[in-house]
């Protein structure tokens, strides 16, 4: 298990990528990757449910690239809703994945959940980042889809979430 804030994947960064990484303060990491047959399970946690969702989004993006090499040049907002906390987490991650894979090729350095309405299962979030570029960002593993398989949301004293991503 990685320590909080520790980079868990080796992207063999160039000097230029290391310089970008050194330019900005590191973003808190409260997540880990768990082995799963043919896929990857994200485990994220936080002091609040909002932080656990944020960390899960960053775990997903951290699997695709070293988010420390991303500069916060643009801002993107994502709002979505679900029928319960699990579907809310699914749609939240799916909307962020869409921003990366189909829409603007946006990769965030940081995602912040502004609000989770637990009564109506709505979420508002914002991300700071830039357009993904292979010449600038190290390539990790493509995330094809979010799955409901074995998804868990624990909204207790220490909120945590588990999500399997299709790679």
From Swiss-Prot:
InterPro entries with a match to the protein in the record: Archease, Archease_dom, Archease_dom_sf
tRNA processing listed as a keyword: yes
Residues bearing the modification N-acetylalanine: 2
A GO CC annotation given for this chain: tRNA-splicing ligase complex
One Gene Ontology term from the biological process aspect of the record: tRNA splicing, via endonucleolytic cleavage and ligation
Sequence positions that bind Ca(2+): 39, 166-167
Gene3D superfamilies the UniProt entry points to: Archease domain (3.55.10.10)
Function: Component of the tRNA-splicing ligase complex required to facilitate the enzymatic turnover of catalytic subunit RTCB. Together with DDX1, acts by facilitating the guanylylation of RTCB, a key intermediate step in tRNA ligation.
Protein name per UniProt: Protein archease
Protein source organism: Bos taurus
């Amino acid at each position: 298990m990685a320590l909080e804030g520790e980079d868990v994947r080796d992207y063999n960064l160039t000097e230029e990528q290391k310089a970008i990484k050194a330019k900005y303060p590191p973003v808190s990491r409260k997540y880990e990757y768990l082995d799963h047959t043919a896929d990857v399970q994200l485990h994220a946690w936080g002091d609040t449910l909002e932080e656990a969702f944020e960390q899960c989004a960053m775990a997903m993006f951290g699997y695709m690239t070293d988010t420390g090499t991303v500069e916060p040049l643009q801002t993107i907002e994502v709002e979505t809703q679900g029928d319960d906390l699990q579907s809310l987490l699914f749609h939240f991650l799916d909307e962020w994945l869409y921003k990366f894979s189909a829409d603007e090729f946006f990769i965030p350095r940081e995602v912040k959940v502004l609000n989770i309405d637990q009564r109506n299962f709505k979420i508002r979030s914002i991300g700071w980042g830039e357009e993904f570029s292979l010449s600038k960002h190290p390539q990790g593993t493509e995330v094809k889809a979010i799955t409901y398989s074995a998804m868990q949301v624990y909204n207790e004293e220490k909120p945590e979430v588990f999500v399997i991503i299709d790679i």
